[in-house]
């Protein structure tokens, strides 16, 4: 399957944007934006979790896929078997909505590819709100997952990530991963540009026989993923901020 996603998300916010406290020891200081009204966790009436990017990165570097990381870190969430699709994913038996920077990914086609829309390298943190909400339309009786992307900072920074995984069963069973990002800015403007690529090998059983692809759900075997993302932030004044997020995402499997 060949999938391409373009995401253009200009945000003009007329309210003060508090800084997300990535290393806050007290959850009361963490600000949640998924409810379209910036509030701390302590002020939220619904059960809320904020998963920091550092936790996600540790799980991904351990060889887990993104949706398996969510199942590990979010209480009550149930995901389907390994593959691109998140068909059947629910929170305590009810449907959920997936967003990137507040933009809803679930479409009327319900193609179950919402979690195959961003590389974990570009995730700052994830906000999870449990329970029904009407802010983003239908299909969110179980809650919502808002993926917040990394933004540029004033200090110049370069990030590089290399990784791999193999089962030592076959020359084609290894995964390869490389990602890089550069960011920087001034007191009034900042930006970040990143490229992340991952190649998935095949799966083999104990007899070194290849496991057959699940064509109905599009498994990750023999596929590659490319995520190119650019973000920019302009501080208009103390109370207004302009953000631009643009993304090219491609997830494609080989013909096996």
What are these regions (language model features)?
Residues 110, 164-168, 212-218, 255-256:
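Extracellular loop and loop/strand-boundary signature of outer-membrane beta-barrel proteins
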Residues 103-130, 230:
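Short acidic/polar hinge/loop motifs at secondary-structure boundaries
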Residues 27-61:
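N-terminal periplasmic "start-of-domain" segments of outer-membrane beta-barrel proteins
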Residues 65, 113, 140-142, 163, ...:
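Transmembrane beta-barrel architecture of outer-membrane proteins
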Residues 118-161:
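A beta-strand signature from Gram-negative outer-membrane beta-barrel systems
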Residues 33, 67-104, 124:
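Extracytoplasmic beta-strand/coil segments of soluble accessory domains associated
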Residues 35, 131, 161-167, 196-200, ...:
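Outer-membrane beta-barrel pore domains and translocons
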Residues 171-201, 209-252:
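Transmembrane beta-barrel wall of Gram-negative outer-membrane proteins
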């Amino acid at each position: 399957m060949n999938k391409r996603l373009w995401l253009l998300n200009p945000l003009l916010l007329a309210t003060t944007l508090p800084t997300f406290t990535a290393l806050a020891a007290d959850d009361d200081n963490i600000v949640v934006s998924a409810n379209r009204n910036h509030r701390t966790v302590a002020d939220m009436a619904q059960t809320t979790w904020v998963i920091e990017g550092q936790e996600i990165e540790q799980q991904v570097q351990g060889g887990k896929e993104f949706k398996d990381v969510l199942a590990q870190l979010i209480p009550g969430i149930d995901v389907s078997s390994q593959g691109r699709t998140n068909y059947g994913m629910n929170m305590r038996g009810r449907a959920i909505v997936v967003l990137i920077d507040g933009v809803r990914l679930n479409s009327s086609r319900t193609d179950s590819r919402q979690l195959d829309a961003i590389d974990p390298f570009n995730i700052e943190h994830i906000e999870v709100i449990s329970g029904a909400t009407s802010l983003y339309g239908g299909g969110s009786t179980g809650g919502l997952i808002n993926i917040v992307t990394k933004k540029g900072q004033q200090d110049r920074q370069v990030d590089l990530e290399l990784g791999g995984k193999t089962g030592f069963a076959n020359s084609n069973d290894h995964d390869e991963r490389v990602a890089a990002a550069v960011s920087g800015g001034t007191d009034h403007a900042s930006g970040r540009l990143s490229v992340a690529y991952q190649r998935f090998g095949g799966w083999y059983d104990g007899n070194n026989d290849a496991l057959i692809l699940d064509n109905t759900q599009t498994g990750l075997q023999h596929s590659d993923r490319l995520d190119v993302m650019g973000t920019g932030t302009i501080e208009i004044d103390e109370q207004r901020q302009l953000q631009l997020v643009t993304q090219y995402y491609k997830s494609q499997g080989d013909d096996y």
